[in-house]
From Swiss-Prot:
This is 3-methyl-2-oxobutanoate hydroxymethyltransferase 1. The active site is at residue 189. It is found in: Cytoplasm. It comes from Burkholderia ambifaria (strain ATCC BAA-244 / DSM 16087 / CCUG 44356 / LMG 19182 / AMMD) (Burkholderia cepacia (strain AMMD)). Belongs to the PanB family.
Length: 271
């Protein structure tokens, strides 16, 4: 069996994401952890495949992402890359792997050698030096602000961020800082719609929302969540796209269409 497929779709690159944002075309991102799903998501029109540390929850059964190791992410990144998707491949830097700029670079090198084309890391102003260090060394960076799951214990749980005036101001500072440091993409998670909209209009780089309203440049969901196969309480920002669909591919195509035409997320998925 081979996962390689002929595709006339142009490869999605980091500059392509910027061009999509500038043209007003929404970016559809999903998490992905293996070659089979990488091929399926790619032919369904997904623009970005994220090897997220969410694999700690949906694959390994942990209650947080903290136990996920760099080797775990590298393994699943290599699995996804073997499908040779046209979609851009982004890999998460796990908890405890980017405490210093030098450590972050060493971790990023391992993931890029495994097949990642961009790395994602969680944090705002305090990460500016690290982001700048990576970008100067040819590592494309996606920042992640708002609710950062690796900070679950510091936050006291999975809570919406930026709800207060002070919190919103900090989120704006974080977003500006990561852009100024050279990040080419930023994920906004569990952020009030109005705040996410302000961030999106303030920045020149694309924003990817998850529980951040419809004004972001694109959307991301955890694959298992959007297919309705992850047990337990479903976050407000999740929609089960498998409902009413005959196949997984049809569900993914429905997700892509909903992101592209801005029918997802709706008010019921936002804060």
């Amino acid at each position: 069996m081979t996962y390689l497929q002929e595709s006339s779709r142009p490869a999605v690159t980091v500059p392509k994401l910027q061009a999509m944002r500038d043209a007003g075309e929404k970016i559809a991102m999903l998490t992905c952890y293996d070659a089979s799903f990488a091929a399926l998501l790619d032919r369904s029109g997904v623009d970005v495949l994220l090897i997220g540390d969410s694999l700690g929850n949906v694959l390994q059964g942990h209650t947080t992402t903290l136990p996920v190791s760099l080797d775990d992410i590298a393994y699943h990144t290599a699995c996804v890359a073997r499908a040779q998707p046209r979609a851009l491949i982004i890999a998460d830097l796990p908890f405890g792997t980017y405490g210093t700029p030098a450590e972050a670079f060493a971790s990023a090198v391992k993931l890029m050698r495994a097949g990642a084309q961009m790395i994602k890391l969680e944090g705002g102003e305090w990460l500016a030096e690290t982001i700048r260090f990576l970008v100067e060394r040819a590592v494309p960076v996606c920042a992640h602000v708002g609710l950062t799951p690796q900070s679950v214990h510091a936050f006291g749980g999975f809570k919406v961020q930026g709800k207060t005036e002070a919190g919103a101001a900090q989120l704006l500072r974080d977003a500006r800082a990561v852009e100024d440091a050279g990040a080419q993409l930023v994920v906004l998670e569990a952020v009030p719609t109005l705040v996410a909209s302000e961030v999106t209009h303030m920045l020149k780089i694309p924003t990817i929302g998850i529980g951040a309203g419809t004004d972001c440049s694109g959307q991301v969901l955890v694959l298992h969540d959007m297919l309705g196969i992850f047990p337990g309480k479903r976050p407000r920002f999740v929609k089960d796209f498998m409902q009413g669909q005959p196949t997984i591919q049809a569900a993914v195509e429905a997700y892509v269409r909903a992101v592209k035409d801005s029918s997802f997320p709706g008010p019921e998925h936002s804060f």
